[in-house]
């Protein structure tokens, strides 16, 4: 039996409500589709300013306040996907290789593994296992006093995987292995040599530990055939004992970077600073100056993100326009390249694209200089 549809009936009210909700949902989808994403931030600095200035949420946690800050919109990323992303992930599992992209929960994993806007595909392989001997309060990598022994096949397996991926730029990082006499420096160096033996054109960056300040280990890495020697200072001097493991020291980091450049002047040296841990502008400026005086040529600055409830809380979400300010200061201080943005990480691919250009130009100039003159 059919009944008449009455405008004021419960059914009519539900239909009108559903229609209104559908319309609102469509409006939200349209706004999201038309809104800026992180690529827009990279390509258009003006967008950074408007997004940061228009956000009315709380960006700084006051002293003694326990509640976590709400994530601002410029730190939200898309789910990683794509053929190249899937290919790399599957091969990593097959060869039992670890990446810092996954272990450290990097927000840029989809962009880096997939190739992104400029087509430069990058990945960051984490050597010597997934367990570190240090326990920095910002890092989500597992820790143990004595991790499992090194896999002697890892250098060859890593090189084979990288050769099959067709990457342009590879970053090798590692856990700290204070339990080993050489800190694993020979293992890292052998991996670089295996990679270069299979593809001499690929650019290799090594983001390495401080090796407890052992300069023999630093020299081993500096002269193994890599292109970029990276070691992160992580934070300002005042916060270093609070943020990093007690065996890591601010001045020791500067010395490692200085000596790496002395051992091999042709290297590009690189470091990274996290913001949002309670540092002041003056302290950031001092750290950047210290790095430049240590001969560091490339610098990245990014937002610290609390990986789990057990790690340091974020004190402040730094606005995109503030990151832009630090990029400009880096250029003023004379860094060859400064990558500064909320989602920038030490192995961020936009920086690698630029560094690749620097390295290619240097190699071309070296070839010209070594060519026989008529």
Swiss-Prot record:
MF terms in GO? 4 iron, 4 sulfur cluster binding; lipoate synthase activity; metal ion binding
Tell me which residues bind [4Fe-4S] cluster 1.
101, 106, 112, 347
Q: Which residues form the Radical SAM core domain?
A: 117-336
Q: One Pfam annotation, family name?
A: LIAS_N
Q: Where in the cell is it found?
A: Mitochondrion
| Highest taxon, organism lineage | Eukaryota
Q: Which reaction does it catalyse?
A: [[Fe-S] cluster scaffold protein carrying a second [4Fe-4S](2+) cluster] + N(6)-octanoyl-L-lysyl-[protein] + 2 oxidized [2Fe-2S]-[ferredoxin] + 2 S-adenosyl-L-methionine + 4 H(+) = [[Fe-S] cluster scaffold protein] + N(6)-[(R)-dihydrolipoyl]-L-lysyl-[protein] + 4 Fe(3+) + 2 hydrogen sulfide + 2 5'-deoxyadenosine + 2 L-methionine + 2 reduced [2Fe-2S]-[ferredoxin]
This protein's cofactor list reads:
[4Fe-4S] cluster
Cofactor binding note: Binds 2 [4Fe-4S] clusters per subunit. One cluster is coordinated with 3 cysteines and an exchangeable S-adenosyl-L-methionine.
Do you know which SMART domains this protein is assigned to?
Elp3
Keyword tags: 4Fe-4S, Iron, Iron-sulfur, Metal-binding, Mitochondrion, S-adenosyl-L-methionine, Transferase
Where along this sequence does the record place binding of [4Fe-4S] cluster 2?
132, 136, 139
What pathway is this protein a component of? Answer: Protein modification; protein lipoylation via endogenous pathway; protein N(6)-(lipoyl)lysine from octanoyl-[acyl-carrier-protein]: step 2/2
Identify the CDD domains for this entry. Answer: Radical_SAM
Q: Name one GO cellular component term.
A: mitochondrion
Enzyme Commission number(s):
2.8.1.8
Q: Which family does it belong to?
A: Belongs to the radical SAM superfamily. Lipoyl synthase family.
**Which PANTHER family would you find in this protein's record?**
LIPOYL SYNTHASE, LIPOYL SYNTHASE, MITOCHONDRIAL
Mention any additional remark: This protein may be expected to contain an N-terminal transit peptide but none has been predicted.
The protein's name is Lipoyl synthase, mitochondrial
């Amino acid at each position: 039996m059919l009944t008449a549809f009455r405008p004021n009936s419960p059914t009519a009210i539900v239909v009108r409500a559903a229609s209104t909700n559908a319309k609102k949902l469509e409006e939200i989808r349209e706004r999201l589709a038309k809104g800026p994403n992180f690529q827009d931030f990279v390509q258009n600095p003006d967008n950074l300013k408007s997004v940061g200035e228009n956000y009315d949420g709380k960006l700084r946690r006051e002293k003694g306040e326990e509640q976590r800050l709400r994530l601002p919109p410029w730190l939200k990323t898309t789910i990683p996907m794509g053929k190249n992303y899937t290919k790399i992930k599957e091969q990593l599992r097959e060869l039992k290789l670890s990446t810092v992209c996954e272990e450290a929960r990097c927000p840029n994993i989809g962009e880096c593994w997939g190739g992104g806007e400029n087509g430069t595909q990058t990945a960051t392989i984490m050597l010597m296992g997934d367990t570190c001997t240090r326990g920095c309060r910002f890092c989500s990598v597992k820790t143990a006093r004595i991790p499992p022994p090194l896999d002697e096949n890892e250098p060859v397996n890593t090189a084979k995987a990288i050769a099959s991926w067709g990457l342009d730029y590879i970053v090798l990082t590692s856990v700290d292995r204070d339990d080993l006499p050489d800190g694993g420096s020979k293992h890292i160096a052998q991996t670089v040599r295996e990679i270069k033996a299979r593809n001499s054109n690929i650019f290799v960056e090594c983001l390495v530990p401080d090796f407890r300040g052992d300069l023999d280990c630093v020299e081993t890495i500096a002269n193994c055939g890599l292109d970029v020697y990276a070691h992160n200072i992580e934070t300002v001097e005042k916060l270093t004992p609070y943020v990093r493991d007690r065996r890591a020291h601010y001045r020791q980091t500067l010395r490692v970077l200085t000596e790496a450049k002395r051992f091999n002047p042709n290297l590009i040296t690189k470091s990274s600073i996290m913001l949002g841990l309670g540092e002041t502008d003056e302290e950031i400026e001092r750290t950047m100056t210290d790095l430049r005086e240590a001969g560091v040529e490339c610098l990245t600055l990014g937002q610290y993100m609390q990986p789990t409830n057990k790690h340091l809380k974020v004190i402040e979400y730094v606005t995109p326009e503030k990151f832009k300010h630090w990029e400009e200061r880096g250029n003023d201080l004379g860094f060859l390249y400064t990558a500064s943005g909320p989602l920038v990480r030490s192995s961020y691919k936009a920086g690698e694209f630029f560094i690749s250009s620097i390295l290619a130009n240097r190699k071309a100039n070296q070839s010209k200089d070594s060519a026989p003159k008529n």
